[in-house]
């Protein structure tokens, strides 16, 4: 079965239970979906995700999300092989480029040579410089930053360098320029950092600071060809929605839409679905992760899932017989877990087309590259053998 349009949708950080190697990351027992369901005590209403097998893919159903008796969809899990548990690792691996060598992390903050260069280039002092939750460090240092014009620099358990500044104090163009310079400092060989993230915020004081949608990711350039490049080279249209474009530094992408929020992202999806094209639309919805996972907010996480599920109903209704929808995640971020970092989890895999005559289990797929291999197979494009297509299993 071949499809004219393939929609790959990443529910950022919506993990499906601890991966077998979770202990190496200190993430034993993490289960984003399971724990959010438990937190909602049976009131997590996800009828559309349930219909296409969200609880079917689990050993234990999500509380409030019934197992579908006869899902005309395929379901399973994917297991990562990349060395990290960041968005970059997950998305690159999906597109045939697993990150086998661990990137640089900074549990004690960034070394003096990086900080000095940032200060010299920007003419501004760096404050913070430690692993911290973004909301917490902005609440703590944001008022000082407004008075002094300093740069709030921080990291996490992932390979990221984040720079926060108030939009009224440091204009976005200047913040982005500083982040571009920071990107140039950590492209190897000594330091190899996955993402530089501009984290602008607004608000009058610590009680009212909010990070804005003007966040930008300056990602390490892909270290090799990805499935997006292969599709583009073969003349297959590639559309990116959300931070997907940033994650691949624009490589292999023909058209990109920036998201203000999950709902804005779904507006873009609705729009793209009205277009007549042959190709792949790769979507990332980041609010689950950025707004609720890192902030350890299970209430917000569950509500975001329910809001997404409602919008998914429209997508399912608008699909053509020759459309394929594949829903997954890039890692976990259990909002009930300790700390504020991503969690090493398996991720859901839900595959649907109105043309399916049946449904069933796709099992546990590893690596994530099976996802991209299936897209390539659909369009008759050769891959690099990192993943194995499951297209032939879809009937």
Curated annotation (Swiss-Prot):
InterPro entries: Alkaline_phosphatase_core_sf (IPR017850), DeoB (IPR010045), Metalloenzyme (IPR006124), Phosphopentomutase_DeoB_cap_sf (IPR024052). It is found in: Cytoplasm. One of its GO terms (biological process) is 5-phosphoribose 1-diphosphate biosynthetic process. Mn(2+) 2 binds at residues 289, 294, 342. Its EC number is 5.4.2.7. It catalyses: 2-deoxy-alpha-D-ribose 1-phosphate = 2-deoxy-D-ribose 5-phosphate; alpha-D-ribose 1-phosphate = D-ribose 5-phosphate. Binds 2 manganese ions. Isomerase that catalyzes the conversion of deoxy-ribose 1-phosphate (dRib-1-P) and ribose 1-phosphate (Rib-1-P) to deoxy-ribose 5-phosphate (dRib-5-P) and ribose 5-phosphate (Rib-5-P), respectively. Belongs to the phosphopentomutase family. This is Phosphopentomutase. It comes from Levilactobacillus brevis (strain ATCC 367 / BCRC 12310 / CIP 105137 / JCM 1170 / LMG 11437 / NCIMB 947 / NCTC 947) (Lactobacillus brevis).
